[in-house]
From Swiss-Prot:
Residues carrying sugar: 124, 128, 219, 235, 353, 370
This protein's encoding gene: SMPDL3A
Protein name per the record: Cyclic GMP-AMP phosphodiesterase SMPDL3A
Residues that hold Zn(2+) 1 according to the record: 42, 44, 107, 292
Single GO MF annotation: phosphoric diester hydrolase activity
Annotated organism of origin: Bos taurus (Bovine)
Length: 450
């Protein structure tokens, strides 16, 4: 693999285009100003990406498969060229949106065979993206979370201090306090209050410790004592009357495109769900990446009352495997919240039509949808999302057809999700623990004899 730093510098120097601006949403009414923050995830930079006549050699991340239709902003068989990542961040910079902070939920390196990377190469990729963000947003507070690819070998994030943990702690020092840096070095997680929102706390979890492929943490009930730390942190926040946003890479709950598969080990998923239910009165939102798709989840308590809203953001990378027919257009998103109590009010999803951008040779990031307007709901509170999910479950639901289009970031609106496909989605949206999830499938089986 070519030297990552040199190639990135070369790509940056070659950049001349400016992305088109999306449609900013001005706060309405005479109430207090609406708070805003950006969420970006899964950049997956592939520095080997280049245009060549041999489509099997366009990028290392295609693993020898032919690129589909490679252009300046990438290809669906490849991870992101630097130009795509820069266009996303430059769009954010020039969008006209005033924000308090940004969350970045991990995965900077490409999907390549393990021997094509190393600890130093992984750190170098993370450093390249970190310095790009810091250069474009010198005065913006950014809260990162580590992804399963932000380590080498991938997925094997440890429970003790490591070279990667030390490296990201040093890279992210401009954004974080000394206390946050200390726990980041120890276990890859941290907490910190938002500087201009004194009663809002960010908790950045290292959920990669619970990820199935992580053999380092196999059979450990509380890797790196993160559960104990999380409960202590939430307990103190509760006493101090703070609100909390949870950010992480690997999400809780079940994957919406397969039956019975949770993104993390079931024991750890159940433990996290128990903690989130216990402190749902102060957790004002949860934000994840990892799946590359756009999805929502609603956490209910054991009596079935919706108590938490969860959002999985789509990736910037458009990559798909040879076994997949569909993928996502690149996306970034903007959340709006009430600055008085930090309740989530709305979300604006922006995207880049990759085919169009490659044809025109310039990026034109656009507003894909505004969540409350698209679904005619009041806000992003658990009650509103739960009601929306109930509408999704209706047969021939136009709302669900729209949701599934957005699931792939408007990559292919002709695809229909029905039958088992729809059941997978509905059960995953509304049921995050094993008992309710299993019961969801049982009810559908009895009703539809599937």
């Amino acid at each position: 693999m070519a030297r990552l730093g040199a190639l990135v510098c070369c790509l940056l120097a070659a950049w001349h285009c400016r992305p088109g601006l999306g449609l900013p949403l001005a706060p309405a009414g005479t109430g207090p100003a609406v708070g805003q923050f950006w969420h970006v995830t899964d950049f997956h930079l592939d520095p080997t990406y280049h245009i060549t006549g041999d489509h099997t050699k366009v990028c290392a991340s295609s693993k020898g498969a032919e690129a589909s239709d490679p252009g300046p902003f990438g290809d669906v068989m490849c991870d992101s060229p630097y130009r795509l990542i820069f266009s996303a961040l430059d769009f954010i910079k020039n969008s006209g949106q005033k924000v308090s902070f940004m969350i970045w939920t991990g995965d900077s390196p490409p999907h390549v065979p393990v021997l094509e990377l190393s600890t130093d190469k992984v750190i170098n990729v993370t450093a390249n993206i970190t310095t790009t963000i810091q250069r474009l947003f010198p005065n913006l507070q950014v809260f990162p979370a580590l992804g399963n690819h932000d380590y080498w070998p991938q997925d094997q994030l440890p429970v003790v201090n490591s070279k990667v943990y030390n490296a990201v702690a040093n890279l992210w020092k401009p954004w974080l306090t000394e206390d946050a840096i200390t726990t980041l070095r120890k276990g890859g997680f941290y907490t910190q209050k938002v500087s201009n929102n004194p009663k809002l706390r960010i908790i950045s979890l290292n959920t990669n410790l619970y990820y199935g492929p992580n053999s380092v943490t196999l059979n450990q009930t509380d890797p790196a004592n993160q559960f104990e730390w999380l409960e202590n942190t939430l307990n103190i926040s509760q006493q101090n009357k703070e609100k909390v946003y949870i950010i992480a890479h690997v999400p809780v709950g079940y994957l919406p495109y397969a039956r019975g598969i949770s993104a993390m080990r079931k024991y750890h998923n159940e433990k996290l769900i128990d903690i989130f239910r216990k402190y749902s009165d102060i957790i004002a939102g949860q934000f994840y990446g990892h799946t590359h798709r756009d999805s929502i989840m609603v956490l209910s308590d054991k009596k079935g009352k919706p108590v938490n809203s969860l959002f999985v953001a789509p990736a910037v990378t458009p990559v798909r495997s040879v076994l997949e027919r569909l993928t996502n257009n690149p996306g970034v998103r903007l959340f709006q919240y009430d600055p008085r109590d930090y309740k989530l009010l709305d979300m604006l999803q922006y995207y880049l039509n990759l085919t169009d951008a490659n044809l025109k040779g310039e990026s034109n990031w656009k507003l894909e949808y505004n969540l409350t307007q698209a679904y005619d709901i009041q806000d992003l509170q658990p009650k509103s999302l739960y009601k929306l999910a109930k509408q999704f479950a209706i047969q021939e639901s136009k709302q669900f057809i729209k949701y599934y289009k957005y699931f792939f970031v408007s990559y292919d609106s002709s695809v229909i999700c029905q039958g088992k496909c729809k059941i997978f989605q509905i059960c995953a949206i509304m049921n995050l623990d094993v008992i309710s999830y299993t019961d969801c499938f049982r009810q559908y089986h009895m009703k539809h004899r599937l």
